[in-house]
Amino acid sequence: MAEIYLAGGCFWGLEEYFSRIEGVKKTTVGYANGQVESTNYQLIHQTDHAETVHLIYDEKRVSLREILLYYFRVIDPLSVNKQGNDVGRQYRTGVYYTNQADKAVIEQVFAEQEKQLGQKIAVELEPLRHYVLAEDYHQDYLKKNPGGYCHINVNDAYQPLVDPGQYEKPTDAELKEQLTQEQYQVTQLSATERPFHNAYNATFEEGIYVDVTTGEPLFFAGDKFESGCGWPSFSRPIAREVLRYYEDKSHGMERIEVRSRSGNAHLGHVFTDGPESAGGLRYCINSAALRFIPKEKMEAEGYAYLLQHMK
């Protein structure tokens, strides 16, 4: 067994979230890395402790790297002393370790996050100090009070975890060699392929769609629907963090551009006219930005970990 301490805003929601992740054996909440050895809920403003979740996990079932990727899924790493509606030093973000060997793993994940975001993150990285177990009524708070306040979606624990470290972006020269002219123009130059006359508009087999530039999984075929727009349409991504969103005012229109996380490839746009029963979104994606992998080939191509999440 191993342990790590994570601060990420109100500890009620963060504890419930991590309690749902396979391999996490025990969670408790407390106050960490303050200026003095003792504190309580009424004093944390004065002692500068952070609301923190203590995780004990089985390294054979979930790694520290995976724990951290789950963590970054539900925090805003750029926000200072604020998560959701909660404001104050006690709601700062931080990763606090007790095993010196963990520091290198944490630093690597931090570096990857900063590279993806293009700026330094506001998450503390420190050895654990002055940890105080929180009062009993805070422990498993949302299990005792299912309708209680929570600033995160704890069901995000059930979304597939896609590790961006497995899907590195090739160099521009490699992309020019690997991709067709249309694939390169769409993904690297934000071009748009012709509607209806593209590879996957009418494809509805079981499987997954991955970023053509990196192989990072983006969409389940089960979330694809016929929209009539002429391009592949999806109601949601495999996991929300695999996509990036940008304001697009090109061609005299105001749209939300969708790009891939690891490859930074232009994929298409997202609109709010999708099926209401599936959340109301329509991800309108260029076939040229995707590669389809049939369900029967997923294991051979390294995507077996996603099979359990397919509809």
UniProtKB/Swiss-Prot annotation:
It catalyses: L-methionyl-[protein] + [thioredoxin]-disulfide + H2O = L-methionyl-(S)-S-oxide-[protein] + [thioredoxin]-dithiol; [thioredoxin]-disulfide + L-methionine + H2O = L-methionine (S)-S-oxide + [thioredoxin]-dithiol; L-methionyl-[protein] + [thioredoxin]-disulfide + H2O = L-methionyl-(R)-S-oxide-[protein] + [thioredoxin]-dithiol. One of its GO terms (biological process) is protein modification process. Residues 172-295 form the MsrB domain. InterPro entries: Met_Sox_Rdtase_MsrA_dom, Met_Sox_Rdtase_MsrA_sf, Met_Sox_Rdtase_MsrB, Met_Sox_Rdtase_MsrB_dom, Mss4-like_sf. Residues 1-155 are annotated as: Peptide methionine sulfoxide reductase A. It is an enzyme of class 1 (oxidoreductase). Keywords: Multifunctional enzyme, Oxidoreductase. It holds the Pfam family PMSR. The active site is at C10, C284 (nucleophile). Its EC number is 1.8.4.11, 1.8.4.12. GO terms for molecular function: L-methionine:thioredoxin-disulfide S-oxidoreductase activity; peptide-methionine (R)-S-oxide reductase activity; peptide-methionine (S)-S-oxide reductase activity. One of its GO terms (cellular component) is cytoplasm. Has an important function as a repair enzyme for proteins that have been inactivated by oxidation. Catalyzes the reversible oxidation-reduction of methionine sulfoxide in proteins to methionine. Involved in protection against oxidative stress when the bacterium enters the host bloodstream and required for maximal growth under aerobic and anaerobic conditions. NCBIfam families: msrA, peptide-methionine (R)-S-oxide reductase MsrB. In the N-terminal section; belongs to the MsrA Met sulfoxide reductase family. In the C-terminal section; belongs to the MsrB Met sulfoxide reductase family. This is Peptide methionine sulfoxide reductase MsrA/MsrB. It comes from Streptococcus gordonii (strain Challis / ATCC 35105 / BCRC 15272 / CH1 / DL1 / V288). The lineage of its organism: Bacteria, Bacillati, Bacillota, Bacilli, Lactobacillales.
